[in-house]
Amino acid sequence: WHTGSNKNIAMSILYRPQKDAKNLDGLTIKIAEILKQAMQENYNIKLTIKEPNDLMLNKKKICGILTESNTIGNKINYVIISIGFNVNEKEFPKELENIATSLYKETGKEFDKEKIIKILIKSLENII
C-alpha cells in the first residue's frame, strides 16, 4: 500500500467489546459493507467490494481493510481494525498507477480527511 505525506488515511482502531467471539464471523466484509454505505450516503460515491478486504472505485483499489482479533475462551479480548484509504493522493508509483486510485484522482476535488475519519468511526461504532 502507498500513502503520501498527509494525503490519505492510515488508521487503526482498537475495540474491547467483551462480546461473544461468534461476532467476529465475517467481520472484515461487514466493515467493508459499512464503509461502502457510509461513502454512498455522505458523498454519493459508489464503491464496490473486492473480497476479502478491498474497496474499489472504477475497478481500482481505493481502500484496504485488515482486522486482527484476540479471544479468551469464547469472548473477544480485543479487535484491531486497520484501514488505509486513498483520499487526496494525486500520484501513485508507476507500478500502482493502473491498480490504485484516490478520491482526488476520481473526482478532481480534495476531501477533508478528518471529516471522513469521523464518518468512518461513527459508522463502525456498533460493528461488533
What are these regions (language model features)?
Residues 19-47, 57-128:
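Long, positively charged amphipathic alpha-helical accessory segments at protein N-termini or as interdomain linkers
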Residues 49-51:
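Short loop/edge segments at beta-strand edges and connector loops
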